[in-house]
Amino acid sequence: MNIPQALAKVVDNIDLSIEEMRDVMGQVMTGGATDAQIGALMVGLRMKSESLDEITGAVMVMRELVTGVTVENRQYLVDIVGTGGDGANLFNVSTASSFVAAAAGAHVAKHGGRSVSSQSGSADLLETAGIALDLSPAQIGQCVDNVGVGFMFAPNHHKAMKYAVGPRKELGMRTLFNILGPMTNPAGVQRLVMGVFSEKLCRPLAEVMGRLGGEHIMVVHSKDGLDEISLAARTHVAEFRDGEVKEYDLTPEDLGLGSDSLVGLDVTDSKASLALIKDAFGKRTTEAACKAADMIALNAGAAIYVSGITRTHKEGVSMAEDLIHNGEAAERMRELAQFSTALKVGDESH
């Protein structure tokens, strides 16, 4: 199916099949579509609302074209990632949570990019923390195996996405591409906590991940609009495991913590985000740092649970709290900075 044929169906509100979507996305991701065609397709799908088959077909193509990362020790292998686009400008909750999950014994293959909609994307934060990003796939695998966490900078692994960069920027709106990245982990992670920008995406994305080999998936969106588990409101969850999706709402109280407002958790840039995370991982000198620690525990607890380390999310949160308070999460962040920098320096000296 060519792109004009696909567009004709989409504008008539007709869903594409998995195979049709694979055809179309194959063209988009190999340079066979013009910017106007890519933009029209993205807007048309958004207006129609992307179907399960369309999302599945698109994810399949992206996974086929990804530059992969090999992780030797795949026990408790997990990612915690958000689509972004919630407009809240919070500190990097999922990135901070990945260090806590690593301290718990998970292997976190963290996938992310630069800021798209927030003030500080995960790559911006890690760079500010002195963590080397421009590592080879083999070196990233070494980080995950040795430190328990490695960061995969999305543009280095999704070269095929370059064809959509122009249209995405010019459209300035959320499209299918915001969803695809988090579902296409270069290390082939099948245990995932994924925050999304709309509650109506929770169930379909959990179902798609399940279709495509997912083992344990939590897709979350909070009632106050975050692509995270919120400290300030109920969070809707679609959880896939054992072949089925269950939907439910969670509160911080369900997980053993008290609710609190998000005041003080928004940041202006990656330096402010890092300062807040370091304080949360350290002495917690401000009310905001205490709240940040709780927010991280809620989300890291989900990753610890989904990785298979604990039997329940609540047990994961309790473990996360301990690791934040005893300094082990901060230590893991330092270790990744040292280990990744040593790999980079080793490269440059050859």
Curated annotation (Swiss-Prot):
Positions annotated to bind Mg(2+) 1: S94, E228
GO cellular component: cytosol
Protein name according to UniProt: Anthranilate phosphoribosyltransferase
Binding site for anthranilate 1: G82
Protein function: Catalyzes the transfer of the phosphoribosyl group of 5-phosphorylribose-1-pyrophosphate (PRPP) to anthranilate to yield N-(5'-phosphoribosyl)-anthranilate (PRA).
Subunit structure: Homodimer.
Reaction catalysis annotation: N-(5-phospho-beta-D-ribosyl)anthranilate + diphosphate = 5-phospho-alpha-D-ribose 1-diphosphate + anthranilate
PANTHER family: ANTHRANILATE PHOSPHORIBOSYLTRANSFERASE
GO molecular function: anthranilate phosphoribosyltransferase activity; magnesium ion binding
Residues annotated for 5-phospho-alpha-D-ribose 1-diphosphate binding in this entry: 82, 85-86, 92-95, 110-118, 122
Pfam families in the record: Glycos_trans_3N (PF02885), Glycos_transf_3 (PF00591)
Keywords carried by this UniProt record: Amino-acid biosynthesis, Aromatic amino acid biosynthesis, Glycosyltransferase, Magnesium, Metal-binding, Transferase, Tryptophan biosynthesis
UniProt pathway: Amino-acid biosynthesis; L-tryptophan biosynthesis; L-tryptophan from chorismate: step 2/5
List of residues binding Mg(2+) 2: D227, E228
Highest rank taxon of the organism: Bacteria
Cofactor: Mg(2+)
Residues at which anthranilate 2 binds: R168
Cofactor note: Binds 2 magnesium ions per monomer.
Family of this protein: Belongs to the anthranilate phosphoribosyltransferase family.
Enzyme Commission designation: 2.4.2.18
Gene Ontology process terms (BP): L-tryptophan biosynthetic process
